[in-house]
Amino acid sequence: MTDSLIIFPAIDLKEGHVVRLSEGDMDRATIYDDDPAARARQFYEAGARYLHVVDLDGAFAGHAMNAAAVDAIVKAFPGTIELGGGIRDMNAIDGWLSRGISRVVIGTAAFENPDLVKEAAQKYPGQIVVAVDARDGMVTTKGWAEQSEISVTDMAERFADAGVVALLYTDVGRDGLKKGCNSEATLALAAATDIPVIASGGVKDIGDIELLARHTKDGIEGVICGRAIYDGSLDLKAALAIARQGGASA
């Protein structure tokens, strides 16, 4: 667990492009860049040392679909890269971690096959993140397309002793809409588990960063920032500065 909030700029990949979805809907994708590696390099030059990458096509297909773009990002961003999307077996985990990815995010497979997570966390300590994607407090799977009857806290409890490095909590109903991060639900999850929590979904502006940065001692490890950065309502350098200052405005 770091002392200050980790800012993860997000690069979501669809057919090799950098996009953002609204509420996880592939038909509501906005293209922001045709050069993912260049965008990753910009984030690094702005001061980011962590990056969150999602293979959106892979999330729906169940296997890697944007490998070339991810490889280019790895070369362009010398920091810590976290990757999710379609990682559903040990071969995929082995493959990505051997190609320079620092941490892999397991979502649907964690729900369907918890033993995979436990095996992977033993094999790769500090490199396995479990995605807890939820709508109205209930877990969603398969690219957010299917709703389960499992609560967020029940999902977290499954991995209490698995050795995962973090839980990535996404409020699907807010993702890509800039409605503001669901800090109440995120903090509730952090309070219910000893696993560090990464917040995602709906980050609107610096106010979300200030709030979350004040709760690193309460189990909040980081926050994923996507559309707000691309649309300009959140300045990455300012967010990084606020995170370093523990939520205090400069």
From Swiss-Prot:
Q: Which UniProt keywords apply?
A: Amino-acid biosynthesis, Cytoplasm, Histidine biosynthesis, Isomerase
Q: Which GO terms describe its cellular component?
A: cytoplasm
Tell me which EC number(s) this protein carries: 5.3.1.16
Give GO MF terms, alphabetically.
Answer: 1-(5-phosphoribosyl)-5-[(5-phosphoribosylamino)methylideneamino]imidazole-4-carboxamide isomerase activity
Q: Which reaction does it catalyse?
A: 1-(5-phospho-beta-D-ribosyl)-5-[(5-phospho-beta-D-ribosylamino)methylideneamino]imidazole-4-carboxamide = 5-[(5-phospho-1-deoxy-D-ribulos-1-ylimino)methylamino]-1-(5-phospho-beta-D-ribosyl)imidazole-4-carboxamide
Highest taxon of the lineage: Bacteria
Against SUPFAM superfamilies, the record matches this protein to: Ribulose-phoshate binding barrel
What does the record list as GO biological process?
A: L-histidine biosynthetic process; L-tryptophan biosynthetic process
- UniProt keyword Cytoplasm present: yes
**Keyword check for Cytoplasm:** yes
List where in the cell it is found: Cytoplasm
Its UniProt pathway annotation is: Amino-acid biosynthesis; L-histidine biosynthesis; L-histidine from 5-phospho-alpha-D-ribose 1-diphosphate: step 4/9
Q: Which NCBIfam families match?
A: 1-(5-phosphoribosyl)-5-[(5-phosphoribosylamino)methylideneamino]imidazole-4-carboxamide isomerase
Q: Which family does it belong to?
A: Belongs to the HisA/HisF family.
Q: Which HAMAP family match?
A: HisA
* Protein name according to UniProt: 1-(5-phosphoribosyl)-5-[(5-phosphoribosylamino)methylideneamino] imidazole-4-carboxamide isomerase
